[in-house]
C-alpha cells in the first residue's frame, strides 16, 4: 500500500537534494544537498519534509544543518560531504564522511562534532553499517577499506583492520549465510540467558565481501583476516566493476562491470574462511542509463539496449525472462532514469514522457504444496493447551494428510507482467517538473516498511554545482556512480523536457524551486490499528438471547443474523491522513468514501449503529480516526456523504493515549496522565469522552484498592457490546462493564499462561518413540471406537491415545514413571521451543487483540491476542509466532465485578469441554485457553468470528525464519533442520546430538583432527562465549557441521527457490475443538494484502497486488489500488460462490461437521447436520462430501435433498456392477473409491452445479460415461415429460447431460446402419469443444475414431477388396470420410501399386484394371485426405503428378516435405534447361517453356516454405529471374518492396538493422553475406529498359538493403551517387554500419552518408551521422544550416571541441543576440571554452560599435570596449608566454607577426576607448555647465578637437553626428537658435543626416530655417495600433 507522499521543501532555492537517507527506527530523513552540506528533515503538520528545527522535533533535533568549515589561506572554506550512513536502530545516529578524508559520528544534537582525520588520506566514498550495527566500515577513493568495532552503549569505535586494492571501493556486503549460523545457533544453545550481541562483533565470526573497481574481490573477517577471492578479468576498453550483489539464501555473490561482464562466485562450505567456488563467467548486454537491480532468488533485472524490453536473468541457471513494455503500456516511449525494486512487490520502471512509473511484478510458478494446497501447513497436537502449526519436533501429526517429508519444490519459469501504473499529479502548485527519476530505494527491516525516494527533474535552468559526491568515470569518461539526472558538472535539465514545457512555467515558480524530491512510502508493516471493521453480529446475538429463543434457530440464523453479518463498515488507511471507508449492505450495495483527516492517523475504530435496520439498506455508524492526541469522528450512512460528527484534541503535555475505541456516541480512551510537567505519567485510567470532547466519566486503574499502582499502561483494548477487555504492558487481561463503568476486574495473566512450563505437557523421548515407532500409512486415522476393549489396542493406538487430551492427567503420571527426571525439562513442550533468546521475555508485549461473542452461548466471548517483542540483534521490534485464544464467560465476570473478585484461569490440565462451576468463590471466568504456535510464521493479526473460528494473518520471510529456526536457509536445508515453511523434527540440538553419537560410534580419523586444527581459533572463540561445559562440548560439532556442509550448484538453486517472502491468511476452524485437532485452511496472498476480518465461510481483506489483464492506474496524490475482496473457505462452501450467499445455518452446521470429521468423530459430526431440515445445509454438505470423497455420507445427503433427479442418478449408478477394489471393511472416509463411485461423485457434482470438479473426475473416461449416459438418458427425458422440468433446471448440468445422452444413442444406431457421415456428426456434437461457461460437459478426451473402429466398416472394406478387387475398394474409399478408414484404403491401393510390374505382360483378365500410375495417384490422394502427407508425397512422386506434389508441399506445413518437393521441381527445371540447350530455343515449343516457368515458380515457393531462402536466391540468380529475386529477397529482409508506391519506411527493417539482436540472425540464418552481395549486385545491374519504372525502383531499394546486410556499403553508396535512388533518412539508417568504433572504413561510410544527407537538405539526419562518426565540425555545420539556435547551443555543450565552439559562436552572432541574453551568454561562454581570446575581444569590440551606431549608447559602448581591451591583452600575453626557445625560426617569426597584429588591434581598441571616453566627458561637461556664460566656447573648442581626432582615425566608433548633435542640444538648452541652425547646415554639408542625431522636437523647430523641408507624418487609419483596445474586451 502506498501510504504517504512527502515533498522536500528547502528554504534556499539555489540548493537541491542530491541523495536522501531514511532510518527504520525513526521518521528522520537525512538529505545531502548540492553544496555539500547535510540537512536533517522531519515531516511537519502538512506532511512535508522541512528542517527539523521547524517541527515538533525541534527539542530533540536542534541542529538541522551540518556543514564542516575550515580556515585556509583563502579564508573559510566549506568541506563537502561525500558519504553517509544511518545506524540501523540507534535513532538519529549517522556517520558522515567528508571530502578532506575525515569523518564524524554525529547526532543532530551536536552543533560542534569532532572529526576523525588521521585514518584516511583521500576523500571518503562509502560508509556502511554491518553486523546489525556493530561493525562500521569506511572506504575512500584510493581503495582503502577500514573496519571498526562499534559500541552501541558508548557510541565509541576501535579500528580492527585496514586494506587497500587498486581502484575505488565499489561496495562491501556481509556474508550473512555463514555468520547467521553462528549467532543464531549460539542463541539456541543459550537457554535462559539473554544474548549479548556485542560479544560476537570483532572476534572473527563475521565475513564481508569487498569489491574494487579495477577488478579485485576480497573477503574481510571482522578480526582482521583478509582472504583474496580473485581478480575479475574485465573486457578490453573502459570497463570497471560497479555492482556487487549477494544472496544469502544461496550464498552466492555476483560482480558486474560497466560493460556487462558477470563474475558469479560462492563458497564451497558454510564455514567462516571457506574457499571460493567460481560458478560462472559470462557477459550481458544492458542499457547503462537504466542500471541493474537485484531481485530475490539470485536474479537481476535490467533493460535491454533497445530500451523497450525488461530482462530478468537467473544467474545460476542463466535463464532469461523477457517482458516487452510496449506490449503492456500504451504509447510507451522509453525508460527514464534508473530502475528500482521493492522486494516481493515489484520492479519500478520510470516512464519517459509520462510523469509516472510502471510496476512489473512476478507471478511465481513454483512452491511447495500439499494435496490440499495448504502450503505444508498442518496442525500438530502437542497438548490440549499448546498446538503447533509447523513444528514437527515433539508432536505427532493428527492431520490425515501426514507431515511433509521435505520441501517438494516444482521448478518452473516465473512470469513477469506489468501489474500497475502510477502517474504524477500535475496540479501541484508549489513546484513544476517534467520527468521522474528514481534515485534510491531504502528498504526497511523485514520488508515491513519500504521507502521509494523519487527524484523529479527540474525546470530550473540555473547552474547548480554538484560539490559533494565523488564521481568515478570509466576509461571512456562516462560517470558510473552518479544519481540519475546529474551530469558531472551541473544538475542540468534532463532529456525529455521540451522548450514549450519550460516556457509555460512562470518565472516565480522557476526561481522558487530547485530540484524537487518526493518520497513515496510503500508500507507493508502490520496494520492492526490502521484497518477497522464492524458489523452488528454481536448486538444481534445479544438481542436474540434476550428474547429467550435459541441462537442456532434457523429463523434467526438465516434472517437477522445473516443480515447483520452481510452488512458491514470497513476502513483502511491508504495515506497518512486518508481513510478509505467501505459500507456494504445485505443487498450487496457497496458504497465507498475517501476521508481526508487533518492530522496523522495512529488508530481507526468503527462502530455500527445497532438500531439501523440492515434489511432496509440504511446501515449507519461512526468512524473514529485518532492520531497526535486528536480524535476525529465521522458519521457514515448508506446513501449519504460522510459528515464530521465531532473533533477534539487532548493536551499531549499532560496526557498520553495508548488506544481508543468507540462505544455508542462515546470514545473510550486508554490514557496515562500527570498533574504537572515535572511529574511522571503515573495515573492509568480509561476515560469516556463524548464525540464532541466533553468528559463523561473516568475509570482509574492505578488507584484501584485491589491492585494499587501495579497496573501498567493499558496497551490495547477491544469492545464487545458493553464488555471492554483491556491488556496492559505486562500482558495482564482486565475487564470492565461499560454500562456501569465503575470497577475493573483482572481476568488472567496471559504472560504466565504462555511462559509457565508447569502447565505444559511433557512427552516421550525420541529414542523411546523410535523403539515403538510404527510406519503404517494411516498415521492420521481417527481414534479407536469407545466400545473396543483396551486389551485389543495396538501399540500405535496406545501411543496415539497417549497423545489425546482426554488422558492428559494420565499421560503426565506415566511420563513421570518412564522418563528420567533430569531429561524431563528437555522434553517439555512450550513456547520456549520456538522463542529464541534474541527476544528477551521482558520485551514481549501485545501487538493486537480482538474479541467476539460466539453462537454457542451469548455470554461466551472468544478472545484472541498476538504479540511482538524486541530483537536484541537488529535493535528493532519484531512480531512473534504465537496466538493465545481464550473463551471467557461474561456472566461470571459480571458476578465478579459485583462481588469485587478477580477471575482466575482454568487449569489447562482439566478435560477440555468440561464446564467450570460457579460458586461462592467466584468460579473461573476463563473457560478454555489454547496457544497456537505458528513458527516460523509470525502473526500480524488474529480475528475471531461468531462461529468459533479464528482468521490469522501470517507473514513468512527468509529473514524472519532465522529468528525461530536457528540457522541459515542453506544450512537448514542441507541438514534437514527445517523446510522454509515448517520446523523439522530434527532440530539443531538434535542434529548436533546425532552427529556426536555418530562420531563416538566410529573412530575419529585424521580428517576430523585436521578439521579441528584448521578451525581451532574459531572453536576457542566460540567456547569462550559459551557458559556451560555441555555447551562448550558441542562447539566442535557445530563448527564441524558448518565446515563439512559443502554447497553444490543444485543446493544453491534449491535455496534460491525459497528466497521470497509470502503472506498467508489462515483459518483455524474449531479453536477449542474437543478432539485437539483444529482444521486449517490457508489462502496465499501477496505481501501488500491486509486482512479485515473472517466472516465464515469467507475472508474479507483489502487486496492490492494481483495479476490482471489491464494494469491498474492511479494518481500520486491519491494512490489507491486497494480493493475489497471476499474469498471463500472451501471447507465450508463452494469456492465458486461468494461466502455471503451461503446461509448462516449451513455455515454453522458445516463448521461443526468439519471440526468433528477432521478428528474422526463422524457420529458427532453427523449429529450436527441431522437436526437441520435446511436444504442449504444438505446441499453444501453434499458438495463437501464430493470434495473429500465421502460416498456413503453423500448418499445420505441426496436422500435429505429429496430430489428425484439425484435419486435416479444414485440408483442407476449404484446398480451397475461394483468393482472388487472396494474394501467395505475400512472406514468410509478412507475407503479407496471404486470406479462407479468416482462416476457417481462426478455426476452429482455436475448436478449440484460444481461442474468443474465433476469434469475433472470424468477426464479420460469417455466410454464409461457413455454407458451411463445411455442408461439415464431416457429416464431423464421421462421425468421432463412428467413435469419435472423445473427440478431438472435446478440440477445444473443435467439438462445438457440428457441432451447428449440422446445424441449418443442416435450415433450408435447410425453406426449399425452404416451411415458413417451422420454418425460422425453426432459424435462431434457430443465431444465438441469446451463450453464450460454454460456448464456443459466438456473436455472428455474422447476419440470418435476409437468408437468407429469398433464397427464393421473397416472389415467391410477388406471384404470388398478381396471379393471385387482394388477398383471396388477405391470406389468405396472415395465415399469415406473417416481418417482411419481412408488410411486403410490408401494402404491397400499403395500395396496394389507396388505389386504391379508395368514391364510384364498383363493377362487378359487384367486389361480393364487400373494401371500403376493411376493407383499411385489415387493412393496419394487418399493419403492426403487423411493427412498422411509423407505417404502421400511418396506416392505422388511415383506418379510424377506436379500439381499434387506442389499441393502437398505447400499444405503439409512440414519443412522436410516442402524441401523434398522443391528438390523435385528444381531437378525438373535443370533437366528442362538441358533440353533447351540441346535442342535450341527455337526448336522448343511454347507450352514447354510455359511449363518450365511454372516449374521454377513452384520450386521457389517450396524452398521458401521449407525455410531455405538461400536456395531460392541461388535459383533466381542462376535463372536470371530478377522480379522473383527481388520479391524473395524483400520477404527475407522483411522489406515491403511488393508495395510499389510505398516509401522505405518499414519499422521492422529499421529495428533489425539498428540493433544486433538475435532475431536478425534468425531471419538471415543460412544466407551468407556473399549470397546477399551477389543478389544485390544482380539487382543493381538490371537495365531499366527491360522493366517498368516501379519494378526497377523496387529492385534498387531491395538491392540497397541487401548490400547493407552484406556490409557492402560502398556498392550501396555508389548506387546513391549514380542517382539510381535518392538518399533519405530511412535509407541512411539502413546503410549505417552496425559497429563504428575502431573501424575507419565504417567511419568513412557514415561520414559519406552524412554529407549526402546534408547535400539533400536533411540536416537533422546529417547531424546524427556526423555525431556517430565523431566528426563534430561537420555536425555543427549541418545544425547551423538547420537554423535552430537552441540545438546549436546544446550540441556545442555536448561536443566540447574548439572548432565547434567557434562555429557556434559565429552563428549566434548572426542572430539577434542583443534581445536574447541566452545567445550572448553562449557566445562568450563558447569563446572562453575554445580559448579563442582574440574572438572574444573582437566580439566585445563589435558590441561597442553596435551600441554606438544603433543605439547611441556610449556608456555601454565604453564598458564593452574596456572588456575588449582586457581580453585582447590576455590574448597577447597568452601568445607571448607560449614562446619556447626550442621553436624554429619560422615559428618564431610567425609568432612575432601574430603578436604585432594583436598589439595593433589593441592599439585601435585603446584609441577608440579614449575617444569614447572623451565624448562622454563632453556630455558630462555640457550637462553640468549648460548655463555657464563661458561654457559655450569651451565646449565648441573641445568638440572641434574631438571631431578632428575622430576624422583622422580609421574605423572610429565615435560618430561625428553624435558630437555635432551634442552641440546642438547644448545650444538648444541655452536658446541659441542661430548656432543650432548653423550646426544643422554644417551636418548637411558633411553628408550627415541631422534627423538621425537630433531630438525630434529640436529638429522640427529649426530645420526650416536651415533650408530643410520638414515632413508632417499624418497618422493614417491603417497605422492605428489596436492592441491596446483588445485588453478592454
Swiss-Prot record:
GO terms for cellular component: 9+2 motile cilium; axoneme; ciliary basal body; ciliary pocket collar; ciliary tip; intraciliary transport particle A. Transmembrane segments: none annotated. It comes from Giardia intestinalis (strain ATCC 50803 / WB clone C6). This is Intraflagellar transport protein 140. Residues 774-795 are annotated as: Disordered. WD repeats lie at residues 76-116, 119-158. LRR repeats lie at residues 957-980, 1019-1044, 1510-1532. It holds the Pfam family TPR_IF140_C. Keywords: Cell projection, Cilium, Cilium biogenesis/degradation, Cytoplasm, Cytoskeleton, Flagellum, Leucine-rich repeat, Repeat, WD repeat. GO terms for biological process: intraciliary anterograde transport; intraciliary retrograde transport; intraciliary transport involved in cilium assembly.
